[in-house]
Each structure stands twice: as C-alpha cells, then as structure tokens.
Amino acid sequence: MYKRQNCLILNHYAADIPDDRFTAMMRLDHNRALSMASKKLGVAVSDLTNMTVWGNHANTQFPDVTYLKVKGEAAADKFDKSWLTDEFIPKVAMRGGEIIKVRGASSAASAATGAITHMRDWYQGTPKGDWVTVALPSDGSYGIPEGLVYGVPCTSDGSGWQRVKDLEISAAQAERMKTTAEDLESERDAVKKLGLLG
C-alpha cells in the first residue's frame, strides 16, 4: 500500500479529526536533498534552510532548491541547471531504489532518522526562518487537488503543521508539481477501485 494513500484512507474514515493531524513522511527525501545540496556547495547541512520536496515519495517527486538559503542568503543560483536536472532531482528521487539495489535492503537507519526528525519538529517546532517538507491532505494551495496527500513546505510552532503559503511558483516548477500530483491521483484512483475510499 502506498504510504500517502494509507494517510488518505485514515483521513477519509476519521473525518472528525482535523486534517492537519494526518501526515505522511517526506522527511527522508527532504534530508537526502539537504545532504546532496550541502555536498555540492561544500557546506554543512545545518547551514541550509528552506529546502522543499514537492509531491510524492516516488520517482516523480520534485526536490526544489528555488527557495534554498545558505546561512540566510539565497542559494538557488549557486547550482547549474544541468546538475539540478541530471543529478540532483533524479538522484534524490531514486536514492531509495539505489540503496535497495546495492544493499539488498532499504536504509532503515535513514528512514528512522526521517521519522524522528519529522516528529521532533512537529512537536517541538521548526527552527525560526526554516521549513521542512511534510505530506498532508491538500487544502488546494498551489493548485494541488484538494484532499490529495502531497508533500509541501511546512512550519510548526509545536501545536501542528502550517503550510508555507504564497510562494512564487514558476511555470517550470508548476509543471513538475503537476506531474507528481498526477502520480498521486493515479494512486488514489487505484485505492478507490479497491473500495477503500467508499
């Protein structure tokens, strides 16, 4: 079962619980994106803020450095487009598969770290001026179909997740965001056909 769809099913059948209490992890992808970007720039992961991974935990996801900062300064123009397109985006998206191919098993430690940091920031709050990626039922922001469990940038003050809103989205970003939304919609439709959202 697709993890985002597990979240969707729970949300569907527990309608009396607020939507923002249902999340699916994108933190493993978020952490991988930060790690790759930090290596490329030759800086510590802790120097980076505002990484975003839009969409699904799948090869259609969109790791996005548009808003990334290094020590508070814009970093997007520090990456060449070919590296982003040919290495960064596909390698972050396909990292899990690469690990399984090499090791014959998933990276349980990385997944556990993702779970720990997801829960820590949910309950203790995200650092001021930073955000993390969380998959939660869409409220329609950024043209993402409402109700679709989709990774978006979020902050937390310790009481729950708040979506980062009103970010400027380019046509190129929108196209990649649409592709991963369509992937999630096809997964949701498959779940519907199984009668799990009836």
Model-derived segments and spans:
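Short Gly/Thr/Asp-enriched flexible loops that form oxyanion-binding sites at enzyme active sites
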Residues: 6-14
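C-terminal substrate-binding/catalytic lobe of Rossmann-fold NAD(P)-dependent dehydrogenases
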Residues: 13-23, 28-198
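Conserved small/polar residues in nucleotide/adenosyl-binding loops
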Residues: 1-2
